Amino acid sequence: MSKSNPSEVKLAVPTSGGFSGLKSLNLQVFVMIAAIIAIMLFFTWTTDGAYLSARNVSNLLRQTAITGILAVGMVFVIISAEIDLSVGSMMGLLGGVAAICDVWLGWPLPLTIIVTLVLGLLLGAWNGWWVAYRKVPSFIVTLAGMLAFRGILIGITNGTTVSPTSAAMSQIGQSYLPASTGFIIGALGLMAFVGWQWRGRMRRQALGLQSPASTAVVGRQALTAIIVLGAIWLLNDYRGVPTPVLLLTLLLLGGMFMATRTAFGRRIYAIGGNLEAARLSGINVERTKLAVFAINGLMVAIAGLILSSRLGAGSPSAGNIAELDAIAACVIGGTSLAGGVGSVAGAVMGAFIMASLDNGMSMMDVPTFWQYIVKGAILLLAVWMDSATKRRS
């Protein structure tokens, strides 16, 4: 079924000010922002302010990093109208391989990273080859991968935990940026963002297209600067910006660019929106799907490196049901399981919501079974709201 042309989540305030501007703001983004604010206020109140302490915010963002990186890869798979149930087991396997290379084989860190990333690409491409060229449903292919990858992990580790990782390996998931470095990177990123925003506005004006009012652009940029610099300042009050958070930010920006500014990204949306129309328009569907799964494998490899580094070990149970968290993050972020609709920014925001709930309920000592029930209910509510919104529109 053909779908409307999707676009990456925009946090922009529309051209007109006040309430009329809010009307054209993407409803899903507005709901997610409201949900994040509500979650933060609730847990801040129930924990007497400890939830927004510098230490806990740092831990929260580190929790978000792994699921967020998985969601960056998963969102493209789902947009292409496919699914990947193997990412949890694949992450455990790749993290286990990294730990074996580091602990048992004593390889230097650069070689360990390269081998892990290449293996992630190959495993993702393996899934993609079966889906794209052998026409096996992705649900079956990745379900088989989930079982096989877990079995391989248990086999190569002999069912034991591979530890401890080296100090160099631990830097990936446990290190923090110096305070000055965090502010410099944040300032450079904001400068690039401001320049990109004004460049886009001037190009639209030159083409005679409607462009946002200058006051709206300045307001959006000021709000972004306050949020970014405020977050860096808060994180520096503890130990600094965690390295996994920096990696997630870079992958988020790269994913957003690929989704909105490249022909490859547009092909992914076209395939998910209407497969036959995409094929008739000249898109190489098989090659595109293969590339999507390979990219997903690369994201899983990065997440696996961070996980093993953060744990200081490779565990046979690592990554268990992580694929469900990644899928839930994408769905909560507005990605349609039917394909053709979704955004990288929304998926990462969904991952942040999931991590916020985990973190807050853990601080409140909520029993584990209730945590699963709450997350399941929120996932169901998010899908229902998305379906209800589409029916009304």
UniProtKB/Swiss-Prot annotation:
<feature type="topological domain" description="Periplasmic">
    <location>
        <begin position="309"/>
        <end position="312"/>
    </location>
</feature>
<keyword id="KW-0472">Membrane</keyword>
<feature type="transmembrane region" description="Helical">
    <location>
        <begin position="215"/>
        <end position="235"/>
    </location>
</feature>
<feature type="topological domain" description="Cytoplasmic">
    <location>
        <begin position="387"/>
        <end position="393"/>
    </location>
</feature>
<feature type="topological domain" description="Periplasmic">
    <location>
        <begin position="86"/>
        <end position="102"/>
    </location>
</feature>
<dbReference type="GO" id="GO:0055052">
    <property type="term" value="C:ATP-binding cassette (ABC) transporter complex, substrate-binding subunit-containing"/>
</dbReference>
<feature type="transmembrane region" description="Helical">
    <location>
        <begin position="136"/>
        <end position="156"/>
    </location>
</feature>
<feature type="topological domain" description="Cytoplasmic">
    <location>
        <begin position="197"/>
        <end position="214"/>
    </location>
</feature>
<feature type="topological domain" description="Cytoplasmic">
    <location>
        <begin position="334"/>
        <end position="336"/>
    </location>
</feature>
<feature type="transmembrane region" description="Helical">
    <location>
        <begin position="65"/>
        <end position="85"/>
    </location>
</feature>
<keyword id="KW-1133">Transmembrane helix</keyword>
<feature type="transmembrane region" description="Helical">
    <location>
        <begin position="176"/>
        <end position="196"/>
    </location>
</feature>
<dbReference type="InterPro" id="IPR001851">
    <property type="entry name" value="ABC_transp_permease"/>
</dbReference>
<dbReference type="GO" id="GO:0016020">
    <property type="term" value="C:membrane"/>
</dbReference>
<feature type="topological domain" description="Periplasmic">
    <location>
        <begin position="1"/>
        <end position="24"/>
    </location>
</feature>
<keyword id="KW-0762">Sugar transport</keyword>
<feature type="topological domain" description="Cytoplasmic">
    <location>
        <begin position="46"/>
        <end position="64"/>
    </location>
</feature>
<feature type="topological domain" description="Cytoplasmic">
    <location>
        <begin position="261"/>
        <end position="287"/>
    </location>
</feature>
<feature type="transmembrane region" description="Helical">
    <location>
        <begin position="25"/>
        <end position="45"/>
    </location>
</feature>
<comment type="similarity">
    <text>Belongs to the binding-protein-dependent transport system permease family. AraH/RbsC subfamily.</text>
</comment>
<protein>
    <recommendedName>
        <fullName>Xylose transport system permease protein XylH</fullName>
    </recommendedName>
</protein>
<feature type="topological domain" description="Cytoplasmic">
    <location>
        <begin position="124"/>
        <end position="135"/>
    </location>
</feature>
<dbReference type="GO" id="GO:0022857">
    <property type="term" value="F:transmembrane transporter activity"/>
</dbReference>
<keyword id="KW-0812">Transmembrane</keyword>
<feature type="topological domain" description="Periplasmic">
    <location>
        <begin position="358"/>
        <end position="365"/>
    </location>
</feature>
<comment type="function">
    <text>Part of the binding-protein-dependent transport system for D-xylose. Probably responsible for the translocation of the substrate across the membrane.</text>
</comment>
<keyword id="KW-1003">Cell membrane</keyword>
<feature type="transmembrane region" description="Helical">
    <location>
        <begin position="337"/>
        <end position="357"/>
    </location>
</feature>
<feature type="transmembrane region" description="Helical">
    <location>
        <begin position="313"/>
        <end position="333"/>
    </location>
</feature>
<dbReference type="GO" id="GO:0015753">
    <property type="term" value="P:D-xylose transmembrane transport"/>
</dbReference>
<feature type="transmembrane region" description="Helical">
    <location>
        <begin position="240"/>
        <end position="260"/>
    </location>
</feature>
<feature type="transmembrane region" description="Helical">
    <location>
        <begin position="288"/>
        <end position="308"/>
    </location>
</feature>
<dbReference type="Pfam" id="PF02653">
    <property type="entry name" value="BPD_transp_2"/>
</dbReference>
<keyword id="KW-0813">Transport</keyword>
<keyword id="KW-0997">Cell inner membrane</keyword>
<dbReference type="GO" id="GO:0015752">
    <property type="term" value="P:D-ribose transmembrane transport"/>
</dbReference>
<feature type="transmembrane region" description="Helical">
    <location>
        <begin position="103"/>
        <end position="123"/>
    </location>
</feature>
<feature type="topological domain" description="Periplasmic">
    <location>
        <begin position="236"/>
        <end position="239"/>
    </location>
</feature>
<feature type="transmembrane region" description="Helical">
    <location>
        <begin position="366"/>
        <end position="386"/>
    </location>
</feature>
<dbReference type="GO" id="GO:0042732">
    <property type="term" value="P:D-xylose metabolic process"/>
</dbReference>
<feature type="topological domain" description="Periplasmic">
    <location>
        <begin position="157"/>
        <end position="175"/>
    </location>
</feature>
<dbReference type="GO" id="GO:0005886">
    <property type="term" value="C:plasma membrane"/>
</dbReference>
